[in-house]
């Protein structure tokens, strides 16, 4: 029996078919590999959810303010590193029960909700002396200031433990007699600031919380002393008006350290000086090539009772 022989033409066809098949397999495999690569690109939420515990910090109960409104709680982190005199004043008045029952007398949509006046008309205050302004501070006085880029209003934009801030160029230090380079809190939604009259040193007890972006009108003119870290939706429910027809009252204000341990807020903030935060900003498209699109659209992620909030 003769062994069948294949012609050279048939052999060439077979080899060609094998090559095409091999190429097809390679293309398909490459496509699957590309798909796999796309699948492993983490979303902003995945980046935050996989951040190690070492990159989260718990709020200090002594510098955590709980503001109770009819709509619910607002949790505020006080920042004595940014405005020590104003934080001390707020804590003193809170512990006196001064704010309990007072109403928000001036609430402007897209701007501020102002309260803390016992007269309810914007002319009152406490019996304590007025405060000197703390509109800005030297960047070197900040324990942490992480620059994430620049924007249309400031050469340096960043965060100090979650608080949005702007600053002058560091290069100015060598040209100034006092060797200071200034940083200030940006008046973005959620920032807590102190109201005053025309005189810079007239702040006393009245405060306002930001419900809009007012950087151009308030930055470096008013002292910011805290940041809402949870419950901002309740701030949005404060009745509008100058004054409102039905002013929203402060039910009570408390310092978390004065509350029973099991009633204290459970809020953690992502460290803005860690490795995770810049990755999150880039992946979310909030900072591109060193340009910050809108600092007021960025907030440090939180974990509230273990649940992540972006």
Can you annotate each of these PLM segments?
Residues 8, 14-15, 120:
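A periodicity- and composition-biased signal for non-globular, repetitive helical segments
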Residues 2, 30-310:
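Cyclophilin-like peptidyl-prolyl cis-trans isomerases
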Residues 1-10:
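N-terminal secretory signal peptides that target proteins for export/translocation
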Residues 14-26:
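Bacterial N-terminal signal peptides
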């Amino acid at each position: 029996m003769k062994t069948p022989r294949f012609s050279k033409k048939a052999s060439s066809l077979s080899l060609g078919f094998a090559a095409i098949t091999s190429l097809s397999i390679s293309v398909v495999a490459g496509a699957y590999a590309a798909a796999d690569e796309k699948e492993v690109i983490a979303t902003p939420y995945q980046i935050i959810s996989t951040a190690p515990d070492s990159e989260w910090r718990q709020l200090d109960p002594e510098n955590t303010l709980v503001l109770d409104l009819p709509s619910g709680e607002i949790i505020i982190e006080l920042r004595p590193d940014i405005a020590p005199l104003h934080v001390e004043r707020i804590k003193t008045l809170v512990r006196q029960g001064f704010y309990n029952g007072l109403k928000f007398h001036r609430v402007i949509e897209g701007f501020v909700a102002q309260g803390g006046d016992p007269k309810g008309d914007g002319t009152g205050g406490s019996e304590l002396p007025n405060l000197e302004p703390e509109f800005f501070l030297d960047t070197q006085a900040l324990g942490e200031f992480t620059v994430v880029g620049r924007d249309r209003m400031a050469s340096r934009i960043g965060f100090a433990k979650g608080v949005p801030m702007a600053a002058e160029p560091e290069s100015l230090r060598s040209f100034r007699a006092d060797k200071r380079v200034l940083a200030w809190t940006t008046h973005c939604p959620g920032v807590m600031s102190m109201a005053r009259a025309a005189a810079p040193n007239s702040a006393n007890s009245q405060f306002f919380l930001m419900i809009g972006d007012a950087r151009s009108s308030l930055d470096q003119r008013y002292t910011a002393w805290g940041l809402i870290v949870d419950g901002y939706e309740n701030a949005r429910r404060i009745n509008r008006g100058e004054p409102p027809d039905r002013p929203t009252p402060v039910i009570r204000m408390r310092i978390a350290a004065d509350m029973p341990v099991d009633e204290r807020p459970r809020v953690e903030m992502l460290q803005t000086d860690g490795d995770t935060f810049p990755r999150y900003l880039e992946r979310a498209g909030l900072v591109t090539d060193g340009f910050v699109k809108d600092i007021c659209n960025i907030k440090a992620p939180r974990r509230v009772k273990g649940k992540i909030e972006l």
